[in-house]
């Protein structure tokens, strides 16, 4: 998985050429047949997506996901509200376009030749490869050559089906697979780690995020090279929606919004550590419930889950932790820092978390106003680890190397250079363990992703349990003693009701 390199000159040229080609489709008033004009008249942009941390998910009634945030901003760009329909698999998404139930698909879908024969692709914004996955401890396949339909199961509409058909025709004549018409890719990955399936195929970003919550999932091999991800809409002679997408993406490229969102959702790195992730998740189950109230109490301006991730990186949630250099406690504070914060006992969990959060808040307050709000925390954490002055040096070095000193994606790449003499010798504040600060922030982000994913999945399971309980009302003891009917009470099947139940119920403000 990697972010696509952006060539701004090429974007400008392509924009001009497409703008000229799409000029007749731009939504001028007085053209009600125009697709964008219809969306504006209706007052809502209808998208279909799938449920995943990368595309769209909810926790505590708050929505998140790269495709969700982009689609929400695109709806704002059009001046309409966003209506979201969540489907179980990719085939259902394209059915929504065919049936006119969606204006576009925003679901991390890969661009390929088969899809663009029937649908209009939008701009691409990152890329993925398709990966064959299996469960840790089971036999790892080294090739696709001998896989059977009993071993390999794929979600309906998955882009890998086209690739497998090509491989079967050209290289692996014995290759076979089965399509599960009822389950999506996430459900199939779950079935793999549950031992119910041998293998499935998923994109590299989905696999990476799934591993943060289920480290038992392992990658056997890549079956494709990097493929661009894009939005899709219906293909016809009206290109107004494509023109609007192009202009929108050009705008967020130029103002840095796309880069910030990519860093937020794709910038957590690929160096997955099975043992470290499993250790963290076990602590989430066994230790976190005891200290979670403290994180919730003292988090203040940041999410408590992020504060918990910081504390895990510092001490593994051990209030008695002590380092060889003398820092102690849950947040590993120095004696001088603790005294400056008015703390009397660094090994008291409440005092340590409160003090560490106040110290971090001081760092956040120092971060220049030019830093975007959603990235200030990363600059502050780097400063928390290596000192604020060295953070200023990293920003200055980024500027000197023609990078963006206000972009965490650019600045973090310069952090390791602060420990290299050719660079630190020319900086105002000199040597710093910048490589440690880089690893410090990246580790915290990974732990946060694991924690958010774990809690989101737990919340979803609880909701499913409650929904199931509502379908099976309690029976009073005296009713158990009544004679049973000799015939079963059949009810009329309503297809529309079944489809309503299959859809995820979302917060009202999204409709």
UniProtKB/Swiss-Prot annotation:
Main location: membrane
Domain of life per record: Bacteria
Non-LT domain as annotated region, ranges: 20-269
Region (LT domain): 270-511
GO molecular function annotations of the record: peptidoglycan lytic transglycosylase activity
Reaction it catalyzes: Exolytic cleavage of the (1->4)-beta-glycosidic linkage between N-acetylmuramic acid (MurNAc) and N-acetylglucosamine (GlcNAc) residues in peptidoglycan, from either the reducing or the non-reducing ends of the peptidoglycan chains, with concomitant formation of a 1,6-anhydrobond in the MurNAc residue
Documented EC number(s): 4.2.2.n1
Pfam families: SBP_bac_3, SLT
Biological process annotations from GO: cell wall macromolecule catabolic process; cell wall organization; peptidoglycan catabolic process
Keyword Lyase assigned: yes
GO cellular component: cell outer membrane
Signal peptide start and end residues: 1-19
Record-annotated active site: 314
Keyword Membrane: yes
InterPro entries: Lysozyme-like_dom_sf (IPR023346), MltF (IPR023703), Solute-binding_3/MltF_N (IPR001638), Transglyc_AS (IPR000189), Transglycosylase_SLT_dom_1 (IPR008258)
Keywords associated with the record: Cell outer membrane, Cell wall biogenesis/degradation, Lyase, Membrane, Signal
Localisation per UniProt entry: Cell outer membrane
Bilayer topology annotation: Peripheral membrane protein
Domain notes: The N-terminal domain does not have lytic activity and probably modulates enzymatic activity. The C-terminal domain is the catalytic active domain.
Record function comment: Murein-degrading enzyme that degrades murein glycan strands and insoluble, high-molecular weight murein sacculi, with the concomitant formation of a 1,6-anhydromuramoyl product. Lytic transglycosylases (LTs) play an integral role in the metabolism of the peptidoglycan (PG) sacculus. Their lytic action creates space within the PG sacculus to allow for its expansion as well as for the insertion of various structures such as secretion systems and flagella.
Family: In the N-terminal section; belongs to the bacterial solute-binding protein 3 family. In the C-terminal section; belongs to the transglycosylase Slt family.
Name assigned to this protein: Membrane-bound lytic murein transglycosylase F
């Amino acid at each position: 998985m990697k972010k696509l390199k952006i060539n701004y000159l090429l974007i400008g040229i392509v924009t001009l050429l497409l703008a000229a080609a799409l000029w007749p489709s731009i939504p001028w008033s007085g053209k009600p047949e125009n697709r964008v004009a219809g969306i504006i008249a209706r007052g809502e942009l209808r998208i279909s997506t799938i449920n995943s941390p990368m595309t769209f998910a909810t926790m505590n009634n708050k929505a998140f996901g790269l495709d969700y945030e982009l689609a929400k901003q695109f709806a704002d760009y059009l001046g309409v509200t966003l209506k979201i329909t969540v489907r179980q698999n990719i085939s259902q998404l394209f059915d929504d376009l065919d049936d006119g139930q969606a204006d576009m698909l925003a679901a991390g879908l890969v661009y390929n030749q088969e899809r663009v024969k029937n649908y209009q692709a939008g701009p691409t914004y990152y890329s993925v490869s398709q990966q064959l996955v299996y469960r840790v401890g089971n036999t790892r396949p080294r090739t696709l050559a001998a896989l059977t339909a009993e071993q390999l199961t794929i979600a309906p509409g998955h882009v890998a089906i086209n690739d497998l058909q090509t491989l079967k025709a050209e290289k692996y004549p014995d290759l076979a697979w089965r399509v599960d018409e009822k389950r999506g890719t996430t459900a199939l990955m779950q079935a793999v780690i549950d031992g119910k399936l041998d293998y499935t195929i998923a994109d590299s970003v989905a696999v990476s995020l799934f591993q943060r919550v289920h480290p038992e999932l392992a990658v056997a091999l890549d079956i494709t090279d990097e493929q661009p991800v894009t939005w899709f809409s219906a293909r016809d002679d009206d290109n107004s929606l494509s023109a609007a997408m192009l202009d929108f993406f050009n705008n967020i490229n130029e103002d840095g919004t796309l880069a910030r969102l990519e860093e937020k959702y794709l910038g957590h790195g690929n160096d997955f550590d099975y043992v470290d992730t499993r250790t963290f998740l076990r602590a989430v189950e066994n230790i976190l419930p005891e200290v979670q109230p403290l994180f919730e109490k003292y988090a203040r301006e940041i999410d408590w889950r992020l504060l918990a991730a910081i504390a895990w990186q510092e001490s593994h949630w051990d209030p008695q932790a002590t380092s060889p250099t003398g820092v102690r406690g849950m947040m590993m504070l120095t004696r001088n820092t603790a005294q400056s914060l008015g703390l009397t006992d660094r090994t008291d969990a409440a005092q340590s978390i409160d003090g560490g959060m106040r110290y971090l808040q001081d760092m956040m307050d120092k971060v220049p106003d030019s830093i975007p709000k959603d990235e200030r925390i990363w600059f502050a954490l780097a400063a928390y680890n290596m000192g604020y002055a060295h953070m200023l040096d990293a920003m200055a070095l980024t500027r000197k190397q023609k990078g963006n000193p206000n972009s965490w994606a650019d600045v973090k790449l310069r952090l390791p250079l602060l420990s290299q003499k050719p660079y630190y010798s020319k900086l105002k504040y000199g040597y710093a363990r910048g490589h440690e600060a880089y690893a410090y922030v990246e580790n915290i982000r990974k732990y946060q992703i694991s924690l958010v994913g774990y809690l989101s999945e737990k919340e979803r399971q609880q909701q499913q349990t409650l929904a199931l309980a509502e379908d099976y009302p309690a029976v009073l003891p005296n009713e158990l003693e009544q004679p049973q009917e000799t015939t079963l009470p059949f009810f009329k099947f309503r297809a529309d009701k079944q489809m309503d139940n299959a859809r995820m119920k979302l917060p009202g403000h999204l409709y």
